[in-house]
Amino acid sequence: MYNYWEPVHLLTQTHGKDTAFETWEYVPQYAIRSWAYAAMHAIVPYLITRVSSLPPYAAFYALRFVLAVLSSVSDALLYEQVARHVHVRVARYLLVFLTVCAGMLSASTALLPSSFVMYTTSLAMAFAMQPASTQAWRRTFYTTAVFAFGALAGWPYAIILAAPYVYEELCLCGSDPSCEHT
């Protein structure tokens, strides 16, 4: 988590070279990581440090709060869609597992690409739970866009998580009665 906080801190704390952190992965000499992920997360700390008179460490906690809200919203949407389109009992089990799993709690506020992919995967799966025939193009577009955004902005290897959805769209057509492939 803190390895990604350092470039965010560098982007938001521009008081001088002595106050900002910099890691070797982001130095132009090596440049093995993209600044896009850090820049995307630097918006909240930047606004906190510029708009308020709070100390710089408040930006750290504000960003973690925003990450917790994103995780909670994506998991709540997934729970709602599982309850609506799968079964209420399955949704209750999902809720229990999401609530008591220590790894999920720890990952929900971590500034890591894998945690970001966790949010986008939960959100994409919430869209994918909707029956294919009820949302027409929106289900396909939103699910594909969120899976792609998670892979492009977070962790590229996470695109494999979309494989079951892609298989359903291409081969099974969900529950769409007008599907010509069946």
Model-derived features with residue positions:
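Hydrophobic core segments of transmembrane alpha-helices in multi-pass, intramembrane catalytic enzymes
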Residues: Y4, L10-Q13, S71, D75, ...
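Transmembrane-helix motifs of polytopic, lipid-linked glycan transferases
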Residues: Y61-R89, L123
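Perimembrane helix-loop-helix junctions
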Residues: A126-F149, P156-T182
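Short acidic/glycine- and proline-prone juxtamembrane loop motifs at membrane-interface regions
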Residues: S106-V117
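Hydrophobic transmembrane alpha-helices
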Residues: H41, P45-T49, D75-A83, A102-L105, ...
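Short helix- or helix-capping micro-motifs
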Residues: L94-A102, F147, A151
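Extracytosolic helix-loop segments that constitute the early lumenal/periplasmic catalytic or substrate-binding loops
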Residues: Y2-Q29, A36, M40-V51
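Loop-to-helix entry region of an early transmembrane alpha helix in multi-pass inner-membrane enzymes
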Residues: A31, W35-A39, R50-V73, A107
